[in-house]
């Protein structure tokens, strides 16, 4: 799969992907947490070898999971167990810690040989990096950073459709998505730091139904959909849920792993009893629709795959914004 260089513009904090001429299949993914094999199984079950696939992720790609390095390698090569898949991801909290592995210069390493920040990351799912050759890992991280890991992403589709993606929440630094995007583009790191925790850990748009202007949809991760559903009195189906025009898609794949110290997890991440890896597919037709593809880990330890339309007009999946 080949993309023109101008099809994706990236800076340190924002990224635009122009898919107005893309004719393949488009998916959204939240918080895969290193479950590479499960994701590959889902991809193989819903696609054919000759199809063009592109996946946009909200971040939290690697930590806590069983195969973080396998997933990183697949993202960098664009090959998922023999299937060609292009992945672009925002930077979640795990990726922001991952970035600190890179030296500020060749003589100064933030995490070398061991620091409080490094141990804090290890305690929160990042210990896997200690098992990887440092030079090799730094090379792979540099490859990631050359194509992705911004705080805010914007996708442009035919029909003047635009979709934003953030790790956990969106916040209006300036009025409207486009002005906020441009502010992040102009900010230095110190200014970004003022707002970054809201993008990485926030949940305002999971609680309060608000329409973000300038985009048709904002896709968000981290906050589990069943906890959002419970807060709004919706059925606990573990399906993505639309709050305002913010689509929350984290279906709890974190809990496909054994979490030895759940108390260390950030507030707002309650256990999901029947977790799933979910790919939300965008079908661009005269009326755009969404299809939900899930690989579900049942309580008996057996995985099942399910595909169904995601009806965002249903009161079971939608809390509309109020003026």
Q: Which functions belong to the PLM regions below?
A:
Residues 28-30, 55-59, 88-93, 218-223, ...:
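Active-site neighborhood of phospho(di)ester-bond hydrolases with catalytic His/Asp-centered motifs
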Residues 1-74:
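N-terminal active-site segment of His-dependent metallophosphoesterases
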Residues 242-323:
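Binuclear metal-dependent phosphoesterase catalytic core
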Residues 123-264, 270:
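Acidic, His/Gly-enriched loop-helix segments that form or flank divalent-metal centers
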Residues 14-22, 44-48, 73-80, 153-161, ...:
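A short acidic-Thr-Gly-centered motif at the start of a beta-strand
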Residues 64-163, 172, 194:
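Active-site neighborhood of divalent metal-dependent phosphoester bond hydrolases
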Residues 33-35, 63, 96, 170, ...:
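Short, glycine/acidic-enriched loop or turn micro-motifs at the edges of active sites
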Residues 53, 83-87, 244:
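A short helix->loop->beta-strand "cap" motif at the edges of active sites that frequently abuts
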């Amino acid at each position: 799969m080949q993309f023109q260089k101008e099809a994706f513009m990236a800076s340190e904090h924002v990224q635009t992907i122009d898919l107005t001429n893309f004719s393949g299949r488009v998916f959204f993914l939240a918080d895969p947490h290193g479950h590479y094999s499960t994701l590959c199984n889902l991809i193989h079950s819903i696609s054919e070898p000759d199809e063009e696939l592109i996946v946009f992720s909200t971040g939290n790609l690697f930590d806590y999971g069983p195969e973080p390095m396998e997933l990183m390698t697949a993202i960098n090569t664009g090959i998922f167990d023999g299937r060609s898949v292009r992945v672009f991801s925002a930077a979640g909290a795990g990726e922001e810690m991952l970035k600190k592995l890179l030296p500020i210069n060749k003589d100064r390493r933030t995490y070398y040989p061991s620091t409080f920040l490094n141990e804090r990351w290890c305690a929160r799912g990042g210990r896997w990096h200690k098992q990887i050759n440092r030079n090799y890992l730094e090379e792979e991280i540099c490859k990631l950073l050359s194509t992705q890991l911004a705080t805010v992403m914007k996708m442009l589709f035919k029909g003047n459709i635009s979709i934003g993606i953030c790790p956990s929440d969106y916040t209006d630094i300036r009025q409207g998505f486009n002005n906020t995007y441009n502010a992040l583009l102009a900010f230095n790191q110190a200014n970004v730091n003022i707002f970054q925790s809201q993008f990485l850990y926030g949940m305002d748009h999971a609680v309060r139904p608000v329409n973000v202007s300038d985009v048709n949809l904002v896709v968000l991760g981290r906050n589990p959909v069943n906890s959002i559903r419970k807060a709004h009195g919706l059925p606990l189906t573990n399906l993505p849920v639309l709050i305002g025009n913010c689509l929350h898609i984290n279906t709890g794949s974190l809990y496909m792993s054994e979490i030895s110290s759940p108390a260390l997890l950030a507030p707002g991440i309650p256990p999901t009893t029947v977790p799933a890896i979910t790919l939300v597919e965008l079908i661009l037709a005269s009326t755009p629709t969404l299809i939900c593809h899930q690989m579900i880990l049942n309580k008996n330890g057996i995985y099942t795959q399910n595909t169904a339309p995601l009806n965002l007009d249903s009161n079971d999946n939608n809390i509309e914004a109020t003026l």
